[in-house]
């Protein structure tokens, strides 16, 4: 009997569900009446009552149009909303990144990706566009020279660093059509190969590596990413590595570097416990090193480095240890954070010490290779003079050290010619420096002869061909050094000396501009050194044609000083007999103290040589100045 009632209830419930009307309210009342009638049919069977109640609940859930309560949402729909809520309220969005003024859009896109998608923290941006202030370089690193924006960020691990670079590179390719490059930790496969090689060496190393492996998941990692876009560089470091390197001090403005100084606030015990996890023979040494570790600034002061360090590197240089010396120099440069110009000046000072100490046994090819290894491929225009000055000083020291192995021709090629072919202008000071080296080498060599002058003259002509501006002949210092390259003594000098003097006189007459006093003095000095008195008096008379009353611009005091120094009895007698000194009275030349002293000395020398000078002396020294 109970089974029959239960089956009839199921059939009626199915019929009610199948033929229920469209009205949700009517269906709801119909179902309630049906359930109430079934409850009164049997009050003794709890099984039927529970079944009917269960079926009534199912009927209520099937009614989609009911107004009493809404149906619950599936769990997967609630997860979508939950993810959006997390994205909108993530802690990474709370980072405040300060952008430099006039930042490019590419920088903003990169920072937003690092911050929101890759989960990097502590993001700092340093603006390196203003590289110089008052001709002084603001940043000590070479990377700052080619970078406009330096980004520093912190990752959670080495894996995180590597993943960030991969994702950043993908974005660069897709959005900016640029492929970034990275320097820093190698990938995990290369790291495993490295560990296998190290493990083969010694048992001690193998055991220490087994207990303290340094795989690519280590916590000390640094990736430097060149975005190849708007000169943006991104540094991705782990927390410990960032604290150790303290790159902020390198790229911060000078006025802000102090706040990035490293503060070793952690105790030595805490540090030693952190790094001595392995129970091996090196742990004790590691603890001692950590206890003695001090906080140093990452900025090096090149001026504090003694040239003796580089001198020691260059002193024992030979063909066999060249590669070792090059490595030592690179290590010194890296450890001291030396720039290219600092290293070049460092080597120039060391070469000067070699020259002063007469270290003749020097491997010159190796010495040159060491200098050229530090010479930049692209010389910055802003401070190019410093680079060429360092190069000139270095090769000058090489020539002074051993002229037989490093000749003047080598200096000309490595300094002047290379500067010209590098796209830089050969200036007057470059030629003046070269001519001074030429003239000093001629005078210092006791065996110098006319053929040495010919060789020197060939180098002079080659150097002059590097200059296109003819206005250089107006520079008295340049003419002085040029004439000195043509004179050894009164018996050994080049005929080109007279050609230059004639050209200067001709150019002065053509332009109707008188030669300046310094230029006249230089020519007189050169002619007195070679003791060509006829040429000297010819030149002096040409100058006298342009002199007139109270307008005699010739340097009489200097002229007499050189005559007194280089002249002889014949010269003194010729000057008295030709009446050259009478032009002092005729043109009313002012008798300055210097001129009076030189006249007195001239008359004294002439009297000692038996030349009558009393009449001329009285006429000149006792002459009264004419009224104005």
UniProtKB/Swiss-Prot annotation:
Pfam families: mRNA_stabil (PF13929), RsfS (PF02410)
Region (Disordered), start-end ranges: 187-218
Keyword Transit peptide set for record: yes
Keyword Membrane: yes
Gene3D superfamilies: Beta Polymerase, domain 2
InterPro entries, per database record: Atp25 (IPR040152), ATP25_mRNA_stabil_dom (IPR025210), NT_sf (IPR043519)
Compositionally biased region (Polar residues): 209-218
Compartments in which it is found: Mitochondrion inner membrane
Basic residues compositional bias, start-end: 194-203
Protein name as catalogued: ATPase synthesis protein 25, mitochondrial
Native organism taxonomy: Eukaryota, Fungi, Dikarya, Ascomycota, Saccharomycotina
């Amino acid at each position: 009997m109970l089974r029959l009632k239960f089956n009839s209830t199921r059939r009626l419930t199915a019929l009610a569900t199948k033929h229920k009307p469209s009205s949700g309210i009517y269906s709801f009342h119909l179902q309630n009446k049906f359930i109430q009638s079934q409850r009164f049919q049997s009050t003794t069977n709890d099984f039927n009552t529970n079944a009917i109640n269960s079926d009534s609940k199912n009927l209520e859930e099937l009614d989609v149009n009911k107004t009493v309560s809404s149906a619950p949402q599936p769990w997967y729909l609630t997860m979508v909303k939950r993810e959006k809520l997390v994205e909108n309220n993530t802690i990474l969005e709370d980072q405040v990144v300060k952008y430099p003024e006039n930042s490019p859009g590419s920088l903003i896109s990169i920072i937003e990706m690092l911050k929101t998608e890759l989960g990097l923290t502590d993001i700092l941006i340093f603006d390196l566009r203003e590289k110089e202030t008052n001709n002084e370089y603001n940043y000590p690193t070479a990377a700052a020279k080619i970078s406009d924006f330096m980004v520093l960020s912190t990752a959670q691990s080495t894996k995180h660093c590597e993943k960030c670079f991969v994702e950043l590179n993908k974005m660069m390719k897709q959005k900016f059509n640029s492929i970034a490059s990275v320097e820093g930790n190698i990938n995990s496969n290369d790291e495993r190969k490295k560990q296998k090689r190290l493990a083969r060496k010694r048992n001690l190393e193998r055991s220490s590596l087994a207990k303290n492996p340094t795989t690519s998941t280590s916590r000390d990692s640094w990736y430097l990413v060149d975005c190849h876009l708007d000169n943006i560089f991104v540094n991705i470091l782990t927390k410990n590595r960032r604290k150790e390197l303290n790159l902020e001090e390198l790229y911060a403005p000078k006025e802000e570097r102090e706040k990035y100084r490293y503060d070793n606030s952690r105790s030595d015990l805490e540090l030693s416990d952190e790094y001595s996890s392995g129970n091996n023979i090196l742990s004790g040494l590691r603890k001692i090193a950590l206890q003695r570790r001090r906080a140093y600034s990452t900025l090096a002061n090149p001026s504090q480095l003694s040239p003796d360090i580089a001198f020691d590197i260059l002193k024992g240089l030979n063909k066999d240890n060249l590669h070792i010396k090059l490595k030592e120099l690179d290590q010194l440069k890296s450890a001291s954070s030396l720039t290219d110009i600092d290293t070049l000046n460092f080597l120039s000072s060391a070469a000067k010490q070699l020259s002063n100490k007469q270290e003749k046994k020097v491997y010159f090819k190796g010495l040159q290779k060491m200098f050229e290894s530090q010479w930049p491929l692209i010389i910055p225009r802003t401070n190019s003079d410093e680079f060429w000055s360092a190069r000139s000083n270095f090769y000058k020291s090489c020539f002074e050290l051993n002229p037989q192995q490093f000749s003047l021709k080598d200096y000309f090629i490595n300094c002047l010619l290379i500067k010209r072919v590098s796209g830089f202008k050969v200036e007057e000071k470059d030629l003046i420096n070269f001519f001074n080296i030429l003239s000093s080498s001629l005078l210092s060599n006791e065996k110098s002869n006319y053929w040495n002058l010919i060789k020197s003259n060939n180098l002079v002509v080659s150097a002059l061909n590097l200059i296109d501006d003819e206005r250089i002949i107006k520079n008295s210092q340049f003419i002085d050094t040029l004439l000195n390259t043509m004179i050894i003594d009164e018996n050994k000098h080049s005929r080109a000396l007279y050609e230059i003097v004639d050209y200067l006189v001709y150019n002065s007459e053509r332009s109707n501009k008188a030669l300046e006093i310094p230029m006249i003095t230089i020519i007189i000095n050169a002619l007195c050194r070679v003791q060509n008195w006829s040429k000297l008096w010819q030149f002096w008379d040409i100058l006298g044609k342009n002199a007139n009353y109270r307008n005699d611009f010739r340097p009489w005091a200097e002229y007499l000083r050189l005559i007194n120094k280089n002249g002889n009895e014949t010269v003194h007698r010729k000057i008295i007999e030709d009446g050259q000194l009478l032009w002092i009275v005729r043109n009313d030349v002012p008798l300055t103290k210097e001129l009076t002293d030189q006249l007195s000395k001239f008359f004294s020398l002439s009297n000692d040589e038996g030349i009558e000078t009393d009449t001329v002396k009285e006429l000149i020294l006792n002459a009264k100045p004419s009224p104005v």
